[in-house]
Curated annotation (Swiss-Prot):
It is found in: Secreted. This is Glucagon. The lineage of its organism: Eukaryota, Metazoa, Chordata, Craniata, Vertebrata. The keyword Secreted applies. It comes from Hydrolagus colliei (Spotted ratfish). Belongs to the glucagon family. PROSITE patterns: GLUCAGON. GO terms for cellular component: extracellular region. Keywords: Secreted. Pfam families: Hormone_2. It comes from the Eukaryota. The gene is gcg. Produced by the X-cells of the islets of pancreas. GO terms for molecular function: hormone activity.
Amino acid sequence: HTDGIFSSDYSKYLDNRRTKDFVQWLLSTKRNGANT
């Protein structure tokens, strides 16, 4: 079941990317909020 392993790895990868994007967004929002 290579597909199952691949899809689980892929979803893990997507989760990591989403988390990083969220953190980046959070930081930039905080930065913008501090600037105003």
